[in-house]
Amino acid sequence: MASSGRYKVKFRRRREGKTDYYKRRIMVISGKPRLVVRFSNRYVLAQVIVSAPQGDFTVAEASSRELVKKFGWLGGTGNTPAAYLVGLLIGYRALSKGIKLAVLDVGLHRVTKGGRLFAVVKGAVDAGLEVPHDEEVQPSEDRLNGEHIAQYAADLKQSNPELYKIRFSKYLARGLEPENISKHIEEVKSKIMEKYAKSEAKAEDSQ
């Protein structure tokens, strides 16, 4: 941190709103892996990071882009259901690397009760990863299952078919009727769980 007179220039990443060094120091000192969740304009990204004297190491990583490429996800890549599925994926991957607990690292993002951040946490916890948090901040099951999207789509389709086609054009182009998104979420969730169940079975057989 540079200084001149009474004014101190903050570290670049703090000025850019990327790193809270005070919170980061506390988490690094704890020695526990960190569950880092970030959002871009289109995607959800989750990482499990371990800090060492040499620097930070990414142990596991998952993104909503992978949901499309590897698990056939047809829904939006930045919404609450996608965030939940990313959490499920990062949870299984962390466990496969021997990580059983991770501390949530929200960076400088504003924490909102029931938001996408906690949808990721819920997914990771459902996978079996321990992430200390208050369960009251988790999104409702209706939002995790996409029922709010399905209901809105069904109502809009009936009241304004043209707007329905415009609003859900990407869903429809991929072959998914948004009214059926809850069923699709369960299908993708099953694919993720099945993949890692097989991975665990192979690991046990090799021992």
Swiss-Prot record:
Keywords: Ribonucleoprotein, Ribosomal protein, RNA-binding, rRNA-binding. It comes from Caldivirga maquilingensis (strain ATCC 700844 / DSM 13496 / JCM 10307 / IC-167). One of its GO terms (molecular function) is structural constituent of ribosome. This is one of the proteins that bind and probably mediate the attachment of the 5S RNA into the large ribosomal subunit, where it forms part of the central protuberance. This is Large ribosomal subunit protein uL18. The gene is rpl18. The keyword RNA-binding applies. SUPFAM superfamilies: Translational machinery components (SSF53137). Belongs to the universal ribosomal protein uL18 family. The keyword Ribonucleoprotein applies.
